[in-house]
Curated annotation (Swiss-Prot):
Function: Nucleotidyltransferase that catalyzes the formation of cyclic GMP-AMP (2',3'-cGAMP) from ATP and GTP and plays a key role in innate immunity. Acts as a key sensor of double-stranded RNA (dsRNA), the presence of dsRNA in the cytoplasm being a danger signal that triggers the immune responses. Directly binds dsRNA, activating the nucleotidyltransferase activity, leading to synthesis of 2',3'-cGAMP, a second messenger that binds to and activates Sting, thereby triggering the immune response via activation of the NF-kappa-B transcription factor.
Keywords from the UniProt entry: ATP-binding, GTP-binding, Immunity, Innate immunity, Magnesium, Manganese, Metal-binding, Nucleotide-binding, Nucleotidyltransferase, RNA-binding, Transferase
Organism: Hydra vulgaris
Pfam families documented for this protein: Mab-21, Mab-21_C
Reaction catalyzed: GTP + ATP = 2',3'-cGAMP + 2 diphosphate; GTP + ATP = pppGp(2'-5')A + diphosphate; pppGp(2'-5')A = 2',3'-cGAMP + diphosphate
Matches recorded under InterPro entries: Mab-21-like_nuc_Trfase, Mab-21_HhH/H2TH-like, MAB21L/cGLR
Residues the entry annotates as binding GTP: D172
Lineage per the UniProt record: Eukaryota, Metazoa, Cnidaria, Hydrozoa, Hydroidolina
Gene Ontology process terms (BP): innate immune response
GO molecular function: 2',3'-cyclic GMP-AMP synthase activity; ATP binding; double-stranded DNA binding; GTP binding; metal ion binding; RNA binding
Gene3D superfamilies xref list: 1.10.1410.40, 3.30.460.90
Binding site for Mg(2+): E77, D79, D172
Chain sites annotated for binding ATP: S64, E77, F78, D79, K230, S246, Y247, H248, I249, K250
Name of the molecule in the record: Cyclic GMP-AMP synthase-like receptor
Similarity section: Belongs to the mab-21 family.
């Protein structure tokens, strides 16, 4: 299909995809104000954790809203890593497939240990939730803030409401330890309390800091491409791509960027076409490696037929008209007309 397309067609494709972005995939208008409110709240939380419990030496902001990857209509979502730097005392053991145990070289730290001084991730996660609950109650009393808290995987999810009590934005508050890779090594890793059934001592290695650094360095066009694919999969596929998450999409973009010559600086339509081709091939092969740990295949447990998803994308790419129609079917009538000219 690509060889048959001329410059005039690519210009049309770019116009249609840009219009789709404007209507379906733009950054939410209130995201910046949410970011400012979040930073104020986290400053209070850091003070609370650092000076009362010595459990926050460093804060790292991430998540789709912080990385400019949220789309209009989505909940505004942030991740915040609350890092206790303990590499002088903690080291990793039994690392495999992105999970590990954290062991202390000192019995005098006040953490939930087993008999071998491994930190119990499940107990620590519950302990951390309790601390956030106490802080939240103080914020509602003294700062008149409106929060609700829920357990959310490794994180405590904080739902922040506006003045009318309506959900404004969500934050995953992630407790994290910085630990050495082994007792004799100075290499440092970040670990978060991943819930694994019947394996409460295991933690997940986190690469959120590296991911955020790469995401923030992506060009505006690359971020636009990610938002467009997110909107396409979310809004135009009747839920078929629910299991192919925004994390899969962002990882695909990292690989395309690593290859070079992406995104196409002159034509957004071509960038999106190349993006879809990469995702289709990954799904067809049933393989999308974790960008920072390539022993992990992110499609291993996707719980949906990757072949079906690949065939669906292939249908969009079969010819020029199908590609244009996929982006114009739900938007302004003028753009629909442009797509069929």
């Amino acid at each position: 299909m690509v060889d048959a397309m001329n410059q005039e067609w690519w210009k049309k494709a770019s116009d249609v995809v840009n219009a789709f972005h404007k209507e379906k995939a733009a950054i939410p208008s209130n995201a910046q104000r949410a970011r400012e409110d979040l930073k104020e709240n986290i400053a209070f939380l850091r003070t609370y954790l650092e000076f009362n419990y010595n459990l926050c030496d460093k804060v790292v902001f991430s998540g789709s809203a912080y990385e400019d990857l949220n789309i209009s209509g989505d909940n505004i979502e942030f991740d915040v890593m609350l890092i206790a730097q303990r590499s002088n005392f903690l080291y990793l053991t039994e690392c495999n497939n992105g999970v590990c145990k954290i062991r202390s070289n000192s019995p005098f730290l006040n953490y939930p240990f087993d008999e071998d001084f491994n930190i119990d991730s499940e107990k620590y996660r519950s302990f951390f939730f309790g601390l956030i609950q106490k802080w939240s109650n103080m914020m509602m009393t003294h700062k008149k803030k409106s929060f609700t808290l829920v357990n959310h995987g490794v994180a405590t999810q904080m739902n922040v409401n506006d003045e009318k009590g309506i959900l404004w934005y969500q934050v995953d508050l992630v407790p994290c330890f910085e630990a050495k890779s082994s007792l004799i090594s100075e290499e440092k890793f970040y670990c978060v309390p991943k819930p694994i059934p019947n394996q409460r001592l295991y933690w997940r290695l986190s690469y959120s800091i590296d991911e955020t650094q790469i995401a923030k360095k992506l060009s505006n066009d690359a971020k636009k491409c990610i938002r467009i694919i997110k909107a396409l999969f979310k809004l135009e596929t009747n839920g078929l791509f629910t299991k192919f998450t925004s994390y899969h999409i962002k990882t695909s973009a990292f690989y395309l960027k690593e290859r070079g010559n992406w995104p196409n600086e002159e034509n957004l339509g071509r960038s999106i076409y190349d993006f879809l081709v990469f995702i289709k091939e990954s799904l067809k092969n049933g393989e999308l490696k974790h960008f920072f740990d390539r022993t992990i295949n992110l499609l291993d447990k996707i719980e949906v037929s990757t072949e079906q998803l690949a065939n669906t994308i292939n249908g969009w790419l079969k010819n020029e008209q199908k590609f244009l129609t996929k982006f114009s079917s739900s938007i302004d009538a003028n753009i629909k007309q442009l797509a069929i000219k």
